[in-house]
């Protein structure tokens, strides 16, 4: 750190929405934090739209460095950090939840203009900056050691950030080894990774459900023999027959990751769950899901919303990756230099399936 007192970082002015590559002092870690040299940072498919203010999220009151997830090496640890060490390679995750004993602790996604829960504005004021920089200061509680993954390229390890979100949904519904699970939206960014995660968790069959037959086939091929592509036609009877045939009957559990304008595919998957089946909702479809009380009651269905994942989830995925159960090698990085962030944001919406957009430092 003595030789790196300055760094390059992208700064966003929340008033003008102007994004500029700047020289900034390299951050020094406060108590409970670490400074990480960033090797790779993830660019979300909607990042350009997000930073332009088109999604209606609440921005910080002052300029900040955007960027959510990353891979890097710890350079310095602050006081009160007991386990993280300089030189340790880590995965950086953004889901910060206030560590206090209350019913609804404040939470936010670091480097992402959105806040959730009372007190989140204060939380964001303390932890403003994200990963689109050569160095970041990050809470030690949100970096996960990845030494067990050896010399795997940072852009490949960044697949952990793609996988951990659907993992949170599958944990929410208690996916068990040997079960049959449907991933709705499996041709999308998170849904495709959900197929790999469900396989790693021991599902006997994973139905990769969606509209894009070509991408679904690619995702299923990457997953192996237990992954079955199910391209939907929009014909409820035909889609039901395809799901039932592939599952060998009813489905035990499902994860919904769709962002389409219609919830029709969600309803189709739901109605192919067995009695007592579970559905995790993690998508962003704006259309309500129409389901009657009687139908819910008669089938003992559980429908659960899930935002993000438990704090121990990234560590679980590192171990699943190190053992070979989670196939990070199936992730397809699209790489850009830090200075090329605008180009990366322009092209990120074109991602399909197991692709990921990454800045390489």
Predicted regions and their residues:
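NAD(P)H dinucleotide-binding glycine-rich loop of Rossmann-like/cofactor-binding domains
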Residues: 96-182
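Short amphipathic alpha-helix with an adjacent loop that forms part of the alpha/beta core around
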Residues: 236-248
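Glycine-rich helix-loop-beta junction characteristic of Rossmann-like nucleotide cofactor-binding loops
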Residues: 171-176, 246-247, 271
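Glycine-rich beta-strand-centered segment in the early N-terminal region that forms part
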Residues: 27-42, 55-108, 149
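C-terminal hydrophobic helical "lid"/dimerization subdomain
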Residues: 1-7, 168, 238, 267-268, ...
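N-terminal Rossmann-like NAD(P) cofactor-binding module of classical short-chain dehydrogenase/reductase
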Residues: 91, 254-255
């Amino acid at each position: 750190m003595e030789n790196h007192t300055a760094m390059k970082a992208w700064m966003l002015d929340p008033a003008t929405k102007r994004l500029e590559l700047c020289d900034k002092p390299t951050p020094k870690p406060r108590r409970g934090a670490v400074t990480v040299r960033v090797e790779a940072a993830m660019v979300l498919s909607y990042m350009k739209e997000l930073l332009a203010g088109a999604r209606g999220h609440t921005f910080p009151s002052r300029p900040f460095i955007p960027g959510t997830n990353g891979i890097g090496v710890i350079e310095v640890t602050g006081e009160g950090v007991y386990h993280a060490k300089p030189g340790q390679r880590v995965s950086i995750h953004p889901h910060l939840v206030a560590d206090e004993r209350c019913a609804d602790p404040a939470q936010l996604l670091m480097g992402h203009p959105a806040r959730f829960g009372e007190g989140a504005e204060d939380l964001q004021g303390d932890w403003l900056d994200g990963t689109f920089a050569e160095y970041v200061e990050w809470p030690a509680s949100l970096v996960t050691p990845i030494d067990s993954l050896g010399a795997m390229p940072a852009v490949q390890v960044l697949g952990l950030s793609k996988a951990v979100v659907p993992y949170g949904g599958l944990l929410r519904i208690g996916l068990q080894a040997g079960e049959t699970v449907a991933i709705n939206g499996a041709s999308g960014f998170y849904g495709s990774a959900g197929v790999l995660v469900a396989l790693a968790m021991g599902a006997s069959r994973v139905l990769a459900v969606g509209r894009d037959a070509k991408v679904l086939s690619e995702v299923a091929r990457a997953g192996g023999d237990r992954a079955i592509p199910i391209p939907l036609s929009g014909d409820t009877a035909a889609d039901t027959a395809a799901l039932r045939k592939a599952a060998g009957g009813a489905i035990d559990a499902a994860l919904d990751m769709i962002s389409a304008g219609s919830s029709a595919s969600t309803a189709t998957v739901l109605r192919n769950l067995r009695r007592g089946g579970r559905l995790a909702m993690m998508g962003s479809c704006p259309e309500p899901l129409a389901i009657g009380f009687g139908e819910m009651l008669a089938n003992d269905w559980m429908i659960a919303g899930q935002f993000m994942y438990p704090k121990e989830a990234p560590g679980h995925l590192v171990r699943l990756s190190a053992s070979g159960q989670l196939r990070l090698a199936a992730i397809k990085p699209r790489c850009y230099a830090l200075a090329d962030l605008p180009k990366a944001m322009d092209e990120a919406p074109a991602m399909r399936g197991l692709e990921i957009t990454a800045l390489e430092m």
